[in-house]
Every structure is written in C-alpha cells, then in structure tokens.
Design a protein with these regions (language model features):
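Beta1/beta-strand and adjacent pyrophosphate-binding region of the FAD-binding site
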Residues: 1-11
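Glycine-rich FAD pyrophosphate-binding loop
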Residues: 6, 20-41
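Conserved Rossmann-like nucleotide-cofactor binding loop
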Residues: 11, 33, 235
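Dinucleotide-binding Rossmann-like beta1-alpha1 core, especially the glycine-rich loop
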Residues: 44-123
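Feature captures the FAD/FMN-dependent oxidoreductase FAD-binding
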Residues: 62-75, 79-90, 138-144, 201-207, ...
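Active-site/ligand-binding neighborhood in enzyme catalytic cores
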Residues: 87, 103, 110-211, 224
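Mid-domain catalytic core of redox enzymes
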Residues: 213-316, 321-330, 334, 359-362
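Conserved flavin/dinucleotide-binding core of flavoenzymes
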Residues: 290-405
Length: 405
C-alpha cells in the first residue's frame, strides 16, 4: 500500500511516523520541513516564529520523550508585560498587577475572577458568541478598550469583531499557568529543529509542489497512491476544496521579524505592545541563555491577512516600519546588528463565531484525509500540541479504514 502525505509540518511528520510500519509512505513538502516550526540557521538554530510549550501539552511532551529529547527539555518562569504610553509594565506577579496604574482595583479583581473561571468553562458553549460583545457585557467599555482591544487588534486586526469568545477563553486558560514569580513555559534547549530532524529521520521526503487528482485512483504529481493525507491550509487544495464542499475558512498571515540587538530591551520575555506595526516583543534571550547564541535575539510579532498590506509589502519596507516602532523602546538603528523578516501566508485560521461547525473531519472521501489547523485538536486555538494530536488521530482513522488494526 502507498500513502502520500502532503506537508512536512508537525501533523504530517507525526502521521508519517505512525503509518510507516504499515505502508510505503512518501511525504511531499514544497518548503522547508517543519512548516511553521522550521528554523533559521546562523551558527545556531532558532525558530523563524517564536515557540514555547506548556505543562499541559501532553502530546508534545510524549513526542519529545519518544524521540529521545527529554534531556533537552527545560522549564523556566518568565516575565510578561504590557507597553503603553511609552512605558513598559511587568504584569508577571500579583504585586505587579496591583501596581499597574492603567486599571482600577475593581478592574483587576474582575480580571482575576475571569481568569480563574475561564479554566473551568467548556469553550464549545461559547463558540457562537462574539468576543467583543462578551467582554463588554462582563467588563464594560473601560477594561475592554484599555486591556483587551489592543491585544485583539494586534492578533486579528480588522477581523477582531468577528472572533469567537471561545478562542479568548482557551487563550486565557492556557496562559494562566502562573506561579507567584511569573508564567512557566518550556523549550527544547538549542531549538525545536532537533525534534523536526528526529521525526524526519527514515522518512522519504520529496521537496516539490503537489497536484492532487482523483481519476479512479488518487494521484500526486502523476503517481498513484492508495490514500492521501493533506495537512496544509484548505485554500491550497484548489478545486478539490470545492469538489468536496469544504468549509470556507478565513486565515490570518504571520509577519514576524527576528532581530539581533546590541542590548536587551528589558528583562521581560513577552511584552504586548499597543499602536505599533508589531503587536508583541518576544525577547528570546530573556528565556534561553544568551550564551547559546552569543547575541540578544528578539522577535517582533505581527499578524495580517493573505490580502493585507503588511503581508504583501516588501520585506525591506516591513523592516523599516518595525525598526521605526522599536525606537520607542530606546532601540536605535545602530543598535540592530541584523533583522530578518519571515512570512507565513496561512499561519492560522481566524476563529470566527461558528467556527466549530467548520472543523474538518479526518475522512473527507474514500482514501482522502485532511488533518492540521482545521482539525478538532486545534480548536479553539492552534498549537504544536494540537497539530501532533491531529497527526496521530488521522493516522488512526486511516489505519481503521484500511484494516491495519
């Protein structure tokens, strides 16, 4: 039996590893292996887009262990903060939050109660509720405008008013794994490229664009296969998406800068930023040791849409805009050793109200499967953990269909 897997990201690599003992598996990838987890090499490896993991990421932790990388796994309590009106405020500890001057004590109390309760809520029950109206009902205009809207605008831009409340509840629950000193997150020391390389070992990976056809049998680039697993974004399926009446899902694009700075911006790992071309500063070397890289490394994260001006403008122009807005953090052009711009056209679905109804099943047609960002494990927020789980579950579905189990 022959199986084609389209996409060598976490979902595709996981599915391939689950199926390789049952069939001849060929993985097709038009870009670098790893997908959104691919890395940049500069004498060391670092992800093109910021990544970290959480204690609850059981699927990811099991995969790291399975591929012998447990010794590389490190956990650290990091600081988070917010930049507003020219100042950076740490919001890492209860004391930090109490000292924050841009919210009243009542606002802070309401926010704390909301954070605690969000951990216990069933996200699916809130799928049809717009996030902005839900927040306005709970907090009124002040907390919505001063705290939530800058983050929603930075993440979703003009689509912020369409996003489901379920997405925010999941986001808050994930990010509320706080200790008294801050938030605990994990990382693979020296980079997630180690996991990608381990998962890709002993797999047949073909670097090529793919044309999938159904003409009696499934074929990829003219070669017949008994089954095809597609792990890419739905728009890249072209006519097949219409043929099988797949849901029309809106995607957002990632525009992320990775920069080397002469000096650290602050001692905070993650700073949410208002009114800038980037929505967050993620200072990687406030998380991992400076000695691993020999330079201060900072991500500047922004989101657009496939049609948006930020995604489509030249990288050089994007770099100029990012560097302009960095000046408010006392970073001058001479302080920047280098900057690289990375773009992903379909980095995440926009989790609009009603998105639950658009989740794609694994089995689309006899011999044709879809898994990835639009699968149930990645609802209502995509993650490395969800992508790995989708890869395992689609493989289990295929094995059951073909009598492998």
């Amino acid at each position: 039996m022959k199986i084609a897997i389209i996409g060598a990201g976490l979902t595709g690599l996981r599915a391939a590893n689950e199926l390789k003992e049952y069939a001849k598996v060929r993985v097709f990838e038009k870009n670098e292996i790893g997908g959104l987890l691919s890395s940049f090499c500069n004498g060391y490896y670092i992800e093109k887009y910021y990544h970290h993991l959480f204690r609850k990421d059981s699927e990811l932790l099991e995969t790291i262990k399975r591929f012998g990388l447990n010794s590389k796994l490190v956990w650290k309590t990091v600081k988070v903060g917010f930049a507003i009106n020219g100042s950076i405020y740490s919001l890492s500890t209860p004391i930090d939050i109490l000292r924050y001057p841009h919210m009243s004590f009542r606002d802070k109390l309401d926010l704390a109660i909301f954070t605690i309760r969000s951990r216990k809520l069933e996200y699916e029950n809130f799928d049809d509720i717009p996030v902005i109206s839900a927040l306005k009902d709970r907090f009124g205009d002040r907390l919505l405008e001063k705290f939530f809207m800058p983050m929603l605008k930075a993440k979703f831009g003009e689509n912020a008013d369409k996003v489901s409340f379920a997405w925010l509840l999941a986001r808050v629950a994930i990010r509320s794994n706080r200790r008294l000193r801050g938030e605990e997150i994990g990382y693979l020391r020296h980079g997630f490229h180690q996991l990608i390389e381990k998962m890709a070992e002993n797999l047949e990976i073909v670097h090529a664009n793919c044309e999938i056809k159904l003409e009696g049998k499934w074929s990829v680039n003219g070669e017949d296969f008994d089954a095809v697993i597609f792990t890419g974004p739905i728009p890249e399926l072209g006519e097949l998406a219409f043929k099988f009446r797949l849901p029309r899902i809106k995607y957002q694009s990632s525009v992320c800068a990775l920069a080397s700075l002469k000096n650290s911006i602050s001692d905070i790992y993650w700073i949410n930023v208002e009114k800038a071309t980037f929505g967050a500063i993620i200072e990687h070397t406030n998380f991992m040791p400076f000695e691993d890289y020999g330079e201060n490394l900072v991500y500047l994260a922004s989101y657009s849409t496939p049609e948006g001006w930020l995604f489509n403008q030249a990288d050089s122009e994007t770099a100029k805009l990012f560097l302009r807005d960095l000046k408010r953090f006392n970073v001058r052009e001479g302080d920047v050793r280098w900057i690289r711009i990375f773009k992903a056209k379909y980095s995440s679905p926009i989790y609009e109200t009603g998105f639950l109804k658009k989740i794609t099943p694994y089995r689309i047609h006899d011999g044709f499967y879809i898994a990835g960002m639009t699968s149930k494990p990645n609802y209502p927020e995509r993650s490395m953990n969800g992508s790995l789980k989708a890869g395992r579950e689609v493989a289990e579905c295929l094995k059951k269909d073909f009598g492998f189990e």
